[in-house]
C-alpha cells in the first residue's frame, strides 16, 4: 500500500483562545486522523503478518508419501516455503511441484541418524512435520527403523538445530491395548507387520518427554479420495474406528502450525458426513493438554 501524506493545518494557540469553533474543528480533525491511523495500522499489520508467514520454511519428512505430498502442496498453497526431505531426490522432482520457487528438495533418510537429518533440516527451518511411514514387507524391523527410531532421529535433529515445533502424523489405536482393543481387527492388522502401532506409540512417548512443542495427529483409516464429510477431532485414546481423507489429514497438520491451541496435544481425527463443520480454533481448543 502506497502511503499518502496529508498536510494538516493546525490552528495556533492564539486562534484557539479566540474561537471555540476552532477548538471543536481541531478535535474533530484529530479524531479523524486517529481513525485513519488505526485503519492504516491494521492493514500494515496484516501485510506484515502475511509476509512473515510467507518467509517461514517448514521441513517435511516423508514428502513424497501419499500424505506427505499433500502436506507439501497445502503448505505451498498457504504461502509457506517448504523443504521437502526425501530419500530419492530424482523421484521427488517428478512427484512434487519442483518448479515452485518456494519448494526446496533435499535428501533425508530418517533411518540414517540425527546428524545427517540436522544437516538436511538446516538453520532455516522453523518447524518439522513428520509424515514418514514404512512400506509393508517381510522386514519386521522396518516399522521400528522408520516409525520409531526414525522419528526419534528427527526429534534429536530438531534439538541440534533449535527447531522447537514438531508435528507427527501417527494413527488411531496406537494405544489399543490400553483401550481394550486387542481384538479389534484394525489393531490386529496394523500390528501384523512388526508391531507397527507399538513402534508408533513408543515414538509418541519419546516426543512427549523431549520438551519440544508437539502436536501428534492420529488419523483413522486413510483414504485417497477427496473429503466427503467434516473433521471430527477427539482426545487421545478415544476413537477406535472410522476413516478420513488424506487431504483432510494434511489440512489438520498445516492448521496445527497456525494455532497455538494445537500445542502439546494429541488429537485423533476421522471424518463423518453428519458432523457439523467447526473451525480449527474450536477443534484444537476443545482438546485438553495432557
PLM features per residue range, with description:
Residues 75:
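Aromatic pocket-lining residues of Rossmann-like dinucleotide-binding sites
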Residues 122, 160, 209, 259-263:
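Alpha-helix termination/capping residues and helix-transition junctions
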Amino acid at each position: 500500500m502506497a502511503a499518502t501524506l496529508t498536510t494538516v493545518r493546525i490552528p495556533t494557540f492564539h486562534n484557539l483562545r479566540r474561537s471555540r469553533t476552532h477548538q471543536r474543528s481541531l478535535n474533530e480533525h484529530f479524531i479523524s486522523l486517529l481513525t485513519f491511523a488505526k485503519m492504516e495500522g491494521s492493514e500494515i499489520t496484516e501485510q506484515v503478518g502475511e509476509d512473515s508467514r510467507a518467509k517461514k520454511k517448514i521441513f517435511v519428512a516423508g514428502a513424497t508419501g501419499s500424505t506427505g505430498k499433500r502436506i507439501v502442496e497445502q503448505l505451498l498453497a498457504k504461502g509457506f516455503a517448504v523443504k521437502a526431505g526425501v530419500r530419492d531426490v530424482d523421484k521427488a522432482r517428478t512427484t512434487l511441484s519442483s518448479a515452485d520457487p518456494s519448494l526446496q528438495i533435499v535428501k533425508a533418510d530418517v533411518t540414517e541418524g540425527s546428524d545427517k537429518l540436522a544437516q538436511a533440516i538446516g538453520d532455516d527451518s522453523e518447524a518439522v512435520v513428520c509424515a514418514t511411514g514404512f512400506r509393508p514387507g517381510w522386514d519386521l524391523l522396518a516399522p521400528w527403523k522408520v516409525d520409531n527410531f526414525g522419528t526419534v532421529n528427527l526429534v534429536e535433529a530438531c534439538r541440534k538445530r533449535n527447531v522447537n515445533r514438531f508435528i507427527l502424523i501417527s494413527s488411531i489405536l496406537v494405544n489399543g491395548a490400553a483401550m481394550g482393543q486387542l481384538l479389534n481387527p484394525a489393531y490386529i492388522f496394523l500390528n501384523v507387520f512388526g508391531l507397527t502401532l507399538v513402534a508408533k506409540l513408543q515414538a509418541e512417548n519419546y516426543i512427549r518427554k523431549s520438551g519440544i512443542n508437539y502436536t501428534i495427529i492420529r488419523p483413522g483409516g486413510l483414504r485417497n479420495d477427496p473429503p466427503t464429510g467434516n473433521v471430527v477431532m477427539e482426545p487421545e485414546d478415544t476413537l477406535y474406528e472410522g476413516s478420513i481423507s488424506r487431504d483432510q489429514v494434511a489440512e489438520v497438520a498445516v492448521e496445527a502450525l497456525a494455532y497455538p491451541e494445537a500445542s502439546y496435544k494429541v488429537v485423533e481425527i476421522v471424518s463423518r458426513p453428519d458432523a457439523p463443520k467447526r473451525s480449527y480454533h474450536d477443534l484444537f481448543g476443545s482438546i485438553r493438554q495432557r
